């Protein structure tokens, strides 16, 4: 009997509930799509949230700018729950959007030592809490190609420091310069990387 290939898992649905007070108190609002400015919804800031479905990117500023935070399924009772081991004290979350490409079963990322996809390269298909411990000879990455899925890259080993979310459906999956990693990108120092799964 012939084996039928399963259809790809449909993208979405996504659902996130945000609160204007810590510990899921105060005003609340549910979203199933992007929000470029939480102030337009009557909030001055998001102080806690629950991700009920899908993976999301939260941003420090409106219009999807500033420090990025990956928001995966679960509860975030305070700002430090989403910034976690981030080396920077950021209590602000003003915009967010779903990560559409996080739904891929197989994730693949190629990192390059230099900008514009030049120099030694390394193909990743798994999580790496320390690139150097796994054989990458540098603490910097010049450019990256996301061939499938979505990834979060961290400035320091152990998934700490600035977070950069890279997606196969943004920039055509090609990030030829570290400044393309996000509006907050200040360095091409990347020392840990992991896949974003739904």
Swiss-Prot record:
Signal peptide: none
Segments of this protein annotated with the region Connecting peptide: 101-106
Residues covered by the Beta/gamma crystallin 'Greek key' domain: 14-53, 54-100, 107-148, 149-197
GO biological process, one term: lens development in camera-type eye
Post-translational modifications: The N-terminus is blocked.
MF GO annotations: structural constituent of eye lens
InterPro entries, per the entry: Beta/Gamma-Crystallin, Beta/gamma_crystallin, G_crystallin-like
N-terminal arm as annotated region, ranges: 1-13
Name of a matching Pfam family: Crystall
Sequence similarity: Belongs to the beta/gamma-crystallin family.
Protein name: Beta-crystallin A1-2
Source organism per UniProt: Aquarana catesbeiana (American bullfrog)
């Amino acid at each position: 009997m012939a084996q039928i290939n399963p259809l790809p898992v449909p993208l979405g649905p996504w659902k996130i509930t945000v609160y204007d007070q810590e510990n899921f108190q105060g005003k609340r609002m549910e979203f199933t799509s992007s929000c470029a400015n939480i102030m337009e919804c009557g909030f001055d800031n998001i102080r806690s949230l629950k991700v009920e479905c899908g993976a999301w990117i939260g941003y420090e500023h409106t219009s999807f700018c500033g420090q990025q935070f990956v928001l995966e399924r679960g509860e975030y009772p305070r700002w430090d729950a989403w910034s976690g081991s981030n080396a920077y004290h950021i209590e602000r979350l003003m915009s967010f959007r779903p990560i559409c490409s996080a739904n891929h079963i197989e994730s693949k990322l190629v990192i390059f030592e230099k900008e514009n996809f030049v120099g030694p390269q390394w193909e990743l298909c798994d999580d790496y809490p320390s690139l150097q411990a796994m054989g990458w000879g540098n603490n910097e990455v010049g450019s990256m190609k996301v061939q499938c899925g979505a990834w979060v890259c961290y400035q320091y080993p152990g998934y700490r420091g600035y977070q950069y979310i890279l997606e196969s459906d943004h920039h055509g999956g090609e990030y030829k310069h570290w400044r393309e990693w996000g509006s907050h990108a200040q360095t091409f120092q990347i020392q840990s990387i992991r896949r974003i799964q739904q």
